[in-house]
A protein has these predicted regions:
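Non-catalytic accessory segments flanking enzymatic or RNA/DNA-binding domains
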Residues: 2-38
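Inter-Walker segment of RecA-like/P-loop motor cores
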Residues: 112-156
Length: 197
């Protein structure tokens, strides 16, 4: 106490080392600075090229791309790197498996590559949509069950989720989609999109 020794964790030490190495001095504790693996770089490059070419050939349609990635591929990290490369600033991540939220949150908040990015969800320990700084990139995470759920009294969109439906997203990511792809909500979502296109 009141000396030159301070209690801290490994994460704090890594963050301090990274900040000194990169001559950055930030309040945020970002202890991760690993680089992309070759298979992640290849997936990002392939996806980037597909999106660029698709938009040229189909300017009025929305491109879709599936990463059929193995376990431990690092989809969250690779998705964020793709978002940076594409220049996306508003990313919606929807899942049928809400337990994966921490992976999306941790990669965004702890890796040095995503400094300044914001993570929004309905969880208590994250930013709320009212607090988003629109000048900075943000990722909104939520479950299909919540975002596609109906207001019981009106039959319409839940009031708390209205902003999600009204936002023009640069990218919508479906994570762990196979857990609920067969459900009616998911089918209705894609049938409505196909009609619009």
């Amino acid at each position: 106490k009141d000396g030159e020794w301070f209690k801290c964790g490994v994460k704090d030490v890594r963050s301090a080392i990274n900040n000194i190495r990169e001559r950055k001095f930030s309040i945020e504790t970002r202890g991760l600075n690993f680089k992309m693996r070759p298979e992640q770089k290849a997936a990002i490059e392939k996806t980037f090229n597909y999106f660029q070419n698709y938009k040229k050939e189909n300017p009025d349609k929305t491109p879709h791309f599936l990463w059929n990635a193995k376990m431990r591929f690092g989809k969250t990290f690779a998705t964020y790197q793709l978002a940076k490369k594409m220049g996306w600033t508003k990313i919606l991540v929807m899942t049928f498996k809400p337990a994966v939220e921490s992976a999306w949150d941790d990669d965004l908040k702890e890796h040095v590559d995503f400094e300044g990015w914001q993570f929004v969800s309905a969880s208590e320990n994250t930013l709320w949509h009212e607090d988003i700084d629109e000048r900075r990139p943000f990722v909104c995470f939520g479950s299909f069950q919540d975002y596609l759920g109906k207001n019981k009294s009106t039959g319409g969109i839940k009031t708390k989720n209205k902003w999600v439906h009204e936002t023009k997203w640069d990218c919508v990511v479906f994570d762990e989609y196979h857990y609920g792809a067969w459900r009616e909500n998911a089918k209705e979502l894609f049938e409505a999109e196909d009609k619009e296109e």
